[in-house]
Amino acid sequence: SGKTTLLRTLLGAVRIMSGDAHVDGKVVGRGSRPSVGYVPQLETIDWNFPVTVEEVVLMGRAMDSGIWPWPRKADRRQMMELLERLGIGAFRHTHIRNLSGGQQQRVFLARALIRSPRLLLLDEPTSGVDIKTRDDVLHLLVDLNRDGVTVLLSTHEINAVAAHLPRVLCINHGVIADGPPR
């Protein structure tokens, strides 16, 4: 019904045929790079390319520059804070392919968050994770929202996540309804 397409449009990955999409006061796709973090539903990693959790997260910092920058101490400190907050600090030097699906999802969330985005786009962030991990991730998203980050997520698990959300926007066959969850 267009949920992923909407997220990818706000990210600037889908060409807008008519009208404009604005993120943080900037028109998407017009040469500007708004401060957006993105966690796709199914992340693709070349499993023949052995990268550690630390390396994957620090790749998020490099997304804004054309070359791989050497991570600064502040980047490493922020990375460790994110990994600890997401409950995966012990896996810092672990190859990502050795993690469970839920742990990998949290690594990709940390990669998006290390950019300190003003808008965080998440495509099915709670799919394939256990109930405790789902609740931990949702509590983190609520905290981020309180800190001024706009969080936009798509989900098929509306009943599971609605209790954590201040506002819900539902798209069903082109019809949009929004408001506080009831």
Where are these regions (language model features)?
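Conserved ABC transporter NBD signature motif
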Residues: 19-32
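Conserved switch/coupling elements of ABC/ABC-like ATPase nucleotide-binding domains
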Residues: 173-177
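H-loop/switch region of ABC-family ATPase nucleotide-binding domains
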Residues: 155-156
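Catalytic Walker B motif of ABC-type/P-loop ATPase nucleotide-binding domains
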Residues: 120-123
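Conserved ABC ATPase "signature" region
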Residues: 58, 72-91
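Conserved ABC ATPase signature
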Residues: 95-99, 103
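Helix-to-loop junction immediately C-terminal to a conserved catalytic motif
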Residues: 11
